[in-house]
């Protein structure tokens, strides 16, 4: 996962503190006050985005090896099942069983690749886990299964993603004006 681009957390916090100190002065001209208030809002937004990216990065780095080994295990199992499905001498019952296993492995792979980025990773193949861990794993696996069945992908950005979901504005033919121009 690439590092977050832009100023670091400490730089942003320092700029925010500087702006807040400046805004505490009572004899500040109105135009400068407005300018610094706007800058403060922008810096606070940047800080929250940087903190979110920092948290994503930290979680990604912590579970990188576990996810790598689980992904390899799932890919290896899929490859084995594909090879066995190519065998034409297999009877129908075994073929259905292989197809069912293949579907499960594909959902496992989707679980590993598209796990929610801001939550601690719950291993698929771990043994001897608590009830809460089992419940979390089953809940996320069921969500991935639903997405797999419907063909939807990337509802949640993958943990390797460096982007935060952005709400898109619905653009119709005449609504191309910007908020800035309306003021």
Curated annotation (Swiss-Prot):
Job of this protein:
Involved in rRNA processing.
InterPro entries associated with the record? Efg1 (IPR019310), EFG1_rRNA-proc (IPR050786)
Q: Could you tell me where the Polar residues compositional bias lies?
A: 158-173
Q: What is this protein called?
A: rRNA-processing protein efg1
Entry's family note: Belongs to the EFG1 family.
Which ranges form a coiled coil? Answer: 33-94
* Region of interest (Disordered), ranges: 148-183
> Which gene is transcribed and translated to give this protein?
efg1
User: What is the native source organism of this protein?
Assistant: Schizosaccharomyces pombe (strain 972 / ATCC 24843) (Fission yeast)
Localization, per the record, is: Nucleus, Nucleolus
Its GO CC terms are: cytoplasm; nucleolus; nucleus
Predominant place of localization: nucleus
Per the UniProt entry, the signal peptide is: none
């Amino acid at each position: 996962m690439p590092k977050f681009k832009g100023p670091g957390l400490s730089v942003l916090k320092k700029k925010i503190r500087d702006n807040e100190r400046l805004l505490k002065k009572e004899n500040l001209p109105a135009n400068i006050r407005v300018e610094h208030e706007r800058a403060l809002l922008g810096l606070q937004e940047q800080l929250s985005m940087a903190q979110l990216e920092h948290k994503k990065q930290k979680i990604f780095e912590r579970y990188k090896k576990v996810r790598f080994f689980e992904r390899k295990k799932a890919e290896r199992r899929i490859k084995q099942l594909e090879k066995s499905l190519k065998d034409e001498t297999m009877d129908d019952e075994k073929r259905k069983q292989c197809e069912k296993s293949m579907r499960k492995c594909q959902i496992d792979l989707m679980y590993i690749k598209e796990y929610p980025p801001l939550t601690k990773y719950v291993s698929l193949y771990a043994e001897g886990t608590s009830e809460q861990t089992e419940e979390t794993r089953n809940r996320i696996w069921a969500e991935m299964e639903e997405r797999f069945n419907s063909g939807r992908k990337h509802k949640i950005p993958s943990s390797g993603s460096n982007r935060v979901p952005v709400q898109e504005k619905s653009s119709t033919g005449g609504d191309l004006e910007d908020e800035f121009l309306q003021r």
